[in-house]
Amino acid sequence: MARKAMIEKWKKTPKYSTRAYTRCRICGRPHSVLKKYGICRICFRELAYRGQIPGCKKASW
């Protein structure tokens, strides 16, 4: 319930622009969000593993 409330609060425009912060579009996680994709590292890893992010593949060297 608290997470849903925070997501609803995040969707509103803040009184000052500096109060705005990024959240994952899928799970609502506020930390470690990749701005380019708008999702957190955990969701990014799952989607990349399934091949749902075009042009993304696992690095190995």
From Swiss-Prot:
Pfam families: Ribosomal_S14. The keyword Zinc applies. It comes from the Bacteria. InterPro entries: Ribosomal_uS14, Ribosomal_uS14_bact, Ribosomal_uS14_sf. One of its GO terms (molecular function) is rRNA binding. One of its GO terms (cellular component) is small ribosomal subunit. SUPFAM superfamilies: Glucocorticoid receptor-like (DNA-binding domain). Gene3D superfamilies: 30s Ribosomal Protein S14, Chain N. Keywords: Metal-binding, Ribonucleoprotein, Ribosomal protein, RNA-binding, rRNA-binding, Zinc. Zn(2+) binds at residues 24, 27, 40, 43. Binds 1 zinc ion per subunit. One of its GO terms (biological process) is translation. Its cofactor is Zn(2+). Part of the 30S ribosomal subunit. Contacts proteins S3 and S10. HAMAP family: Ribosomal_uS14_2_B. PANTHER family: 30S RIBOSOMAL PROTEIN S14, SMALL RIBOSOMAL SUBUNIT PROTEIN US14M. Binds 16S rRNA, required for the assembly of 30S particles and may also be responsible for determining the conformation of the 16S rRNA at the A site. Belongs to the universal ribosomal protein uS14 family. Zinc-binding uS14 subfamily. This is Small ribosomal subunit protein uS14. It comes from Clostridium novyi (strain NT).
